[in-house]
Amino acid sequence: MPRPKPDDRSDNVEKLQEMVQNTIENIQKAEETMQFASPEEQEKIRAKNRRREEAIAAMRAEIRDEAAAREHGCQ
């Protein structure tokens, strides 16, 4: 039976930062498309962007946690 791989957290901060950047870009693209959307679609886009903002806040908190763990020698 193969042994499970050890938990490698060494690049979590970088991965999370990339995810934050991608989410910000998705928000910007969605806002650009709103001008062509119906009022109903605009509200859906606004709601989705609010959820994206919440996700960004959670990812940034996780970045802080991962950076602190890295500083204290956890890998």
Curated annotation (Swiss-Prot):
Domain of life: Bacteria
GO biological process, one term: asexual sporulation
Cellular location(s): Spore core
Transmembrane segments: none
Keyword Glycoprotein: no
Keyword set includes Cell membrane: no
Keyword entries, A-Z: Sporulation
Induction summary: Expressed only in the forespore compartment of sporulating cells.
NCBIfam families: SASP_tlp
Family in the record: Belongs to the Tlp family.
Full protein name: Small, acid-soluble spore protein Tlp
Lineage: Bacteria, Bacillati, Bacillota, Bacilli, Bacillales
